[in-house]
Amino acid sequence: MKIATIAKYVDQPMILNKLDNKMPKLLILAGGTLGVADSIKTAKKDKKNAKKKLVQNAIIISSTIGASLLGTRGLKIRNKKVFNGLMERVDFSKLQKMQTKAVDKFLDKVQVSDKDVLNALNTAKVKELSPKQIDILTNKLPESPAKEELFSVILPKKKNLNSKEIFSEIKRLSLLGLVPVVGGVGGGIIADRLTNPSKNEKSSTSAKKRIANKVKEGLYQYLANIFLCNVGAGTALFISERLENAKKIKPLTPMKKLVVILSGITATGIIGGSYIANYVSKKCIDPLFGEAKSKKLYSERKPEALDIALHADDIATAGILSGFKWIEPALPFMYFVSGYRAGIGYRNGKKDNEQDKKVRVS
């Protein structure tokens, strides 16, 4: 089976619709599994705080997932749209009507006698095409304006973004990443207030420290793992487009474009992201919460293996900017860990930091 056929298969509007509809369930399942596993781990090491950890995890995970779903899907109350989501969504029934109309219009213009082609066209009216049916339509239908118009609906080509569209998409993707992080920080602060009531000045100072950690980790996750990577991807793609227009480089294929984007992500996000995030925390957030200045930039938060793993969402960003639409429904799932880590106020630099000790509750 050709790679091009697989790419067309997963980028079908009806496949994207199914992936989008399954994402909330997968997100809730993943979040619930993480919360239960972490709570069980805490119970084994610190039974006294096990219940508290369970409550905190439930609040943080719920707020992160809730914010993510609101951001992607928008809000509707009594069938009235309050605000739109950041991801384009089309009802399956509407897709069926659109594809049925496109197929009928094609058959009005072109006579088709091949049974395999007719079966594939009838399938396209109600559900996604199989890889075999995609090959049949691609190879057996002669090239014509009618075929091109049909394929623009049932098998749309990857969109080649121009510079203006690139930065518009970067803005949207950055907002998609920001929403779960804000949800995680907000949920973390609420969870902390509910499970750690301030009884005296000492506990009040400790609570302030925990809030500061959540804000700093939220900033770290957003800048290092999301925003700066998006900026790097967009900038690299913008520069390559300018070079291509000036005939300095050959036209970029989708795979070459992917390499260019990943290079931009590596330069700005993976290499410079943690430095910039920690620098902003030291200069802005620490003074805001009255924390003592530290000479070492990585005294509280240093990059680790999981941070590299979290850059899987940057590969997804690269895929979207390169025109691979099937990746987009998975973005809320990929951003979830960033939101959760922000919510618990994860810190790994100081040995005496309470978030670094797994037996303690964030």
Residue ranges and their predicted role:
Residues 1-362:
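Glycine-rich, hydrophobic membrane-spanning regions of integral membrane proteins that mediate transport
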